[in-house]
């Protein structure tokens, strides 16, 4: 990354943590050699250019391989995932090769565990096809509340044009136990 404005920016830390909130816009004039990390971490809702904040972190405590280091725990990786991808930023996870130019067995095992944990987390969508009611809906069938649970990435719900806030309720049909809720913003229509 550089001090020049680009469509992808460093998130401002090497812990893999995006700001909350994080905006995918910045003001071109602020991206200079002395830009503040806090500004990079959050972006700017009034920015004049699109610039995705990319969260980067190493699977180990440093960027290079050392025999005496172990990969981060699955708990730590999941925390990083929720504080990067969960906040709408891509995660660049560094895997340093060992002195033979290969990935360490412990790192490969942790990556597989990480993938399996993510797959398990997203395996069951209790809300898919569930009934949804909303406080407001745009008068266009393209943005109906039922789109929230249709399982499609190319549909979305939108408030009526005059609404500033809104809410929706998803009826799962029965009691369900879960610990993760995934909400996606229709970025094609702008970040809000």
Question: Which residues does each predicted region cover?
Answer:
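Short beta-strands within extracellular/lumenal beta-sheet-rich domains
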Residues: 160-174
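A short beta-strand element within beta-rich, extracytoplasmic domains
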Residues: 176-188
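Residue-level detector of short, conserved catalytic/binding motifs and their immediate flanks
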Residues: 89, 168, 179
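Mature catalytic domains of secreted/periplasmic carbohydrate-active enzymes
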Residues: 1-149, 155-162, 182-185
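Short, surface-exposed beta-strand/strand-loop-strand elements in extracellular ectodomains
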Residues: 190-192
């Amino acid at each position: 990354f550089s001090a020049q404005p680009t469509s992808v920016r460093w998130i401002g830390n090497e812990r893999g943590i995006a700001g909350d909130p994080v905006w995918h816009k910045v003001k071109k004039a602020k991206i200079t050699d002395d830009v503040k990390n806090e500004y990079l971490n959050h972006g700017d809702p009034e920015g004049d250019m699109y610039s995705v904040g990319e969260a980067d972190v190493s699977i180990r405590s440093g960027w290079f391989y050392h025999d005496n280091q172990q990969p981060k725990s699955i708990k730590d990786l999941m925390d990083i995932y929720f504080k990067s991808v969960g906040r709408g930023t891509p995660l660049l996870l560094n895997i340093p090769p060992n002195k033979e130019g290969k990935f360490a067995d412990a790192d490969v095992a942790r990556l597989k565990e990480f993938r399996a944990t993510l797959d398990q987390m997203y395996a069951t969508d209790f809300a898919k096809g569930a009934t949804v009611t909303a406080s407001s809906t745009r008068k266009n069938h393209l943005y109906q509340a039922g789109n929230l649970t249709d399982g499609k990435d190319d549909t979305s719900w939108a408030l009526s044009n005059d609404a500033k806030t809104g809410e929706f309720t998803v009826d799962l049909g029965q009691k369900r136990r879960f610990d993760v809720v995934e909400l996606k913003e229709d970025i094609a229509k702008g970040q809000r």
